[in-house]
From Swiss-Prot:
Gene behind the chain: rplX
Family stated for the protein in its record: Belongs to the universal ribosomal protein uL24 family.
GO molecular function: rRNA binding; structural constituent of ribosome
The protein, known as: Large ribosomal subunit protein uL24
Annotated organism of origin: Acaryochloris marina (strain MBIC 11017)
Main function: One of two assembly initiator proteins, it binds directly to the 5'-end of the 23S rRNA, where it nucleates assembly of the 50S subunit.
Domain of life: Bacteria
Annotated keywords: Ribonucleoprotein, Ribosomal protein, RNA-binding, rRNA-binding
Amino acid sequence: MAKKKSTAKRYKMHVKKGDTVQVIAGKDKAKVGEVIDVLPKLSQVVVEGVNMKTKHVKPRSESESGQISTVEFPIHSSNVMLYSNKENVASRVCYTFDDSGRKVRMLKKTGEIID
């Protein structure tokens, strides 16, 4: 019998690239940063200045020297909450319709529309 191809599931993400989020769990709890990258197949996000790890880079040519650099690594999307810069508070997100009938994201605590 032939094996079924396993297709990676794409998770619905409540954050988008460019959103300001606050980390709510883990070693970087309470840190605020901007979402750099979204990985929906893994349900993870990369946040600026969060989950920093040191990476040892090998030299590509003989004349070049190796180096140690710090890079942001992804964290699970359930560990971040959208953050309001106006009110300085993190909040869950809900979906609502604006006056023109377009579906937009809104912060539950403040009522601030994100999109």
